[in-house]
Curated annotation (Swiss-Prot):
Associated pathway: Amino-acid biosynthesis; L-tryptophan biosynthesis; L-tryptophan from chorismate: step 5/5
Cross-referenced InterPro entries: Trp_synth_b_CS (IPR006653), Trp_synth_beta (IPR006654), Trp_synth_beta/beta-like (IPR023026), TrpB-like_PALP (IPR001926), TrpB-like_PALP_sf (IPR036052)
Family as reported in the entry's similarity comment: Belongs to the TrpB family.
Gene name of the record: trpB2
Cofactor: pyridoxal 5'-phosphate
Entry keyword set: Amino-acid biosynthesis, Aromatic amino acid biosynthesis, Lyase, Pyridoxal phosphate, Tryptophan biosynthesis
Residues carrying N6-(pyridoxal phosphate)lysine: K99
Protein's name according to its UniProt entry: Tryptophan synthase beta chain 2
Organism for this UniProt entry: Corynebacterium efficiens (strain DSM 44549 / YS-314 / AJ 12310 / JCM 11189 / NBRC 100395)
CDD domains linked to this entry: Trp-synth_B
GO function term, MF aspect, one: tryptophan synthase activity
Keyword Amino-acid biosynthesis in record: yes
GO cellular component terms, A-Z: cytoplasm
Amino acid sequence: MTTPATPTRQTLLDAYFGEYGGQFVPEVLLPALDELERAYVEALEDPTFQQELDDLYTNYLGRPTPITECANLPLEGQGRGTARIFLKREDLVHGGAHKGNQTIGQALLAKRLGKTRLIAETGAGQHGTATAMVAALFGMKCTVYMGAKDVARQQPNVYRMRLMGAEVVAVDEQSGNGLSSAIDVAINDWVNNLEDTHYLLGTAAGPHPFPTLVKKFHSVISRESREQMLERTGALPDAVVACVGGGSNAIGAFAQYLEDQPGNEKVRLIGVEPAGYGLDTDLNGAPIHEGRTMHLHGSNSYALLDEDGNLRNSHSVSAGLDYPGVGPEHAHLKDTGRAEYVGATDAEALQAFRMLSRYEGIIPALESSHALAHALKMAAEATEPINILVNLSGRGDKDVAYVRQLLGDHAALDPATDVLTEVDVLGVLEELTPQADTA
């Protein structure tokens, strides 16, 4: 069955999630999107493709990833003895985050298309690292675009990318949105190098078929977690919680629970947006809460707009969530009510970062810390037994130096008694950004 990608275009697969999605791109890109969609459809029908993908998941990425129950967190209120928090350990995937799930899938498609060069945008550097990783694995050239502010706060990942042979280009953030600006520049590169280049978009946004194939490759997260929770607890989780920027890790964590399977309808799906300095300020990255619909980076979805209807700056302590838009399926899930979307502030995320590090010996990515922050809040408010599954989308090694500057003397104090309530993220970023390596 074909479906319109715009009011007049036809695609092999459904290009929309309700009213969200589509292919709102320059006409020159449409043949490349069609080519990618055909390759994806053909790959799904080719058993050798799935065999190669599964082999790489197992023997290169190290899947399946385990589930760890938090055993020592000093839960507050009713949560003590009532709530159980489980972590889906995507931080243990080779590369340090969930991103490798789909970079391997897209790189295999690029190989089928005869492409020799991969380009990508990155915020926290995790997607850039995963792209550089698969480019090295498959012997392909690689260029990664990254906002100058993000280059400054994610130096370990910048070095990792270059170590694996990638060219890292610091992007002038004219719009104030590092990740958004990096996507703009990457799309421009793709337009000018379609013959040999595949744009390995890093999130579940962008023009069709990117949201669909990114979800497919990341759905391995929830396929595993559903089976693991049944085996571990004898039941599905009461709630699955994941952070949401563009939304790739969350859509992967939700995917299997969206299928028509017994018990799925009872599982709450909760996406946590970066509330930054607060949802009542303009210093956040929460388009589902604060945004309106617009065409951004090739698809129709929610985005942060100013009073004049122009894209406005986003803000988050975590570079990977500092994006003014969100993937179209998340917009649809919000509208239908199948998923809930909440916010966690910079301070709440940093507090969760400290708690998991101090009490469980697991240093989470700042992105994942937003999801953990909401899980801790749910646990504190629980009045009856509840099993909460948090998608720990990445590890926090990349954030340690940055967090050290943010926390100062708080780093050595017990977070259970020294509760962080505010933090001067913008002040630290202003000090960091001039040091960005723009080579």
